[in-house]
Amino acid sequence: MASNGAYPVLGPGVTVNPGTSLSVFTALPFATPSPGPTHRPPLVTAVVPPAGPLVLSAFPSTPLVAGQDGRGPSGAGASNVFVQMRTEVGPVKPPQAQTLILTQAPLVWQAPGTLCGGVMCPPPLLLAAAPGVPVTSAQVVGGTQACEGGWSHGLPLPPPPPAAQVAPIVSPGNAGPWPQGAHGEGSLAPSQAKARPDDSCKPKSVYENFRLWQHYKPLARRHLPQSPDTEALSCFLIPVLRSLARRKPTMTLEEGLWRAMREWQHTSNFDRMIFYEMAAKFLEFEAEEEMQIQKSQWMKGPQSLPPPAPPRLEPRGPPAPEVVKQPVYLPSKDGPKAPTACLPPPRPQRPAETKAHLPPPRPPRPAETKVPEEIPPEVVQEYVDIMEELLGSHPGDTGEPEGQREKGKVEQPQEEDGMTSDPGLLSYIDKLCSQEDFVTKVEAVIHPRFLEELLSPDPQMDFLALSQELEQEEGLTLAQLVEKRLLSLKEKGCGRAAPRHGTARLDSSPSEFAAGQEAAREVPDPQQRVSVETSPPQTAAQDPQGQGRVRTGMARSEDPAVLLGCQDSPRLKAVRPTSPPQDHRPTCPGLGTKDALGLPGESPVKESHGLAKGSSEETELPGMVYVVGSHHRLRPWRLSQSPVPSSGLLSPGGRGPQGALQSPSAQKRGLSPSPSPASKSKKRPLFGSPSPAEKTPHPGPGLRVSGEQSLAWGLGGPSQSQKRKGDPLASRRKKKRHCSQ
């Protein structure tokens, strides 16, 4: 009799199809007269639906009628097994007696009221054990849906299509070879094909494996919750659990899953590709089935309420032939595959204790390799070489030349790019830079163009042209260098002085203006003062009396017209920039402001102060003052003869040579200069800023003084009476003549 709480144990060849209403039956073993010892099989308990027909195949592992070879006599007769059936769900009813006929021919489950020869169609997912086939690998436990229905707490199974309802029935007497498609996957035995036309059935379709795959997926997810191999493992469980059921019928589900997981971990990646491909096809079938369900729901519309448990629609029509034509991929075709324990596992084993239910992972992609792509080493080396070349060119741009330019040194052409790598040369350069005499000589011969480019904001400097000029100047002496630079500056000064002559708006005749231009040609440009002061002070030897100024190194101008041109421009000095004429001593008077001119209306205090100042510094003046005075007396003084840029050397009211020449020349013209109070205290440097009077020129009517007014003003001033009296000036002139002789 059956027990209600018995744990379901599947034997080989037992059809299991769980449904909503289940029945429990017990198969009792029996014995027939035989010369050998009788083997009693274990008690078999299975769960079957009462509505569908039951088909039990022969027990291959332990035959019911055993002979000497374990198979029993070939001519054994039929035996009857009485099984009591009762229904577990619903009200208790009296048991119905049914007859189970077990023979060495195909076994038929016969219900009361049916013909004994009638063969009922078995359930769709029927496993038929194959006797005579050695079971060496761990393959399936129990029936195809036994795990899901009997061991997975009764999950519902939709009714199968009629095309897949017939399963083979194999007798235990068949020990011959199996055709292609063995392992109980749907192939027929030769004796079965000869027995009856009704017993022959079609092989199991891919659709049947697809349903098994759907029921095995929860088991695979329970053991591999976060792995993308869930679908492939579900396909792997179909043949493995089937083989385990044949090998050990009393094996439980947990033990079978544990053995299947161990077998999966020892399977190579090449063998797994078959199950990955099968899982990909099953995923396509599942997606198509879901689309069919959605379409059917849309066709029904919201008017009709859906049933509480709608059956899953089967793919019919065009998809059906495609499903049938798909072959079933199994590990091998000649027999069950033996476990390959020698192969290392492809990935670390996950613990089987992890039973957490997580959302299903994405479908596997077998074609993709999970190993990240690595960059080839030759590409990396090429990149490193390029970066080294790029980084190696930058340090030379900001290397040594900048520091050497700060010290005033001139680099050779081969050191222009800053790639000097000779340590001896660098140490020698540092040694030279530490010597003050060397630095002084270098500063004396430094090129002015180099200074201009160095101080200019333009970062692009033409070092090539500069180096060529420096190479040409290497063979020149110091005097030749000074002369060359003075000539270049004089040419620049003539070019710059030309527009200044045109801007001077003076009321002079054309002849007088031409005479002024002729005098201007002989006067160097004011900018020559910059280069002259940078020259070494060897010109001091040319002036042994100390009367000349060392900082001006040009030859003395002997042309009286130049001196008169400089003297005849007292008003233009307020307009011109501060720059001196190039001579040992300034020849232009320091007149340029209203304070320096003895205009009518000024106090006689300034006149007396100017005379006193001139007398105090007369000892420094050479005999050129007399020449200036004599020529000034012979020629009338006119303002119009002063287009020469002679102003700017001296600040108004300055001292030194400026003040020394100021008062005598002013006295010879009949003027009384009076310096400003600020100029009495200290001397102004040559490069000092101009006075406020020079910064703010007065281009008013003062510049438009006619020649007649200037002549009358210069001759009729209050200082003419002093000249006629000759009290202080006559004695001074005599002294000057005596000194000049």
UniProtKB/Swiss-Prot annotation:
Composition bias type Basic and acidic residues, residue spans: 402-412
InterPro entries tied to this protein: NUT, NUT_N
PANTHER family xrefs: NUT FAMILY MEMBER 1 (PTHR22879), NUT FAMILY MEMBER 2F-RELATED (PTHR22879:SF2)
Gene: NUTM2G
Comp. bias (Low complexity): 639-650
Amino acid composition bias (Pro residues), ranges on this chain: 304-321
Sequence ranges of Polar residues compositional bias: 528-545
Composition bias, Basic residues: 731-741
Region (Disordered): 172-200, 293-375, 391-424, 496-624, 638-741
UniProt protein name: NUT family member 2G
Family: Belongs to the NUT family.
One of the Pfam families matching this protein, by short name: NUT
Record organism: Homo sapiens
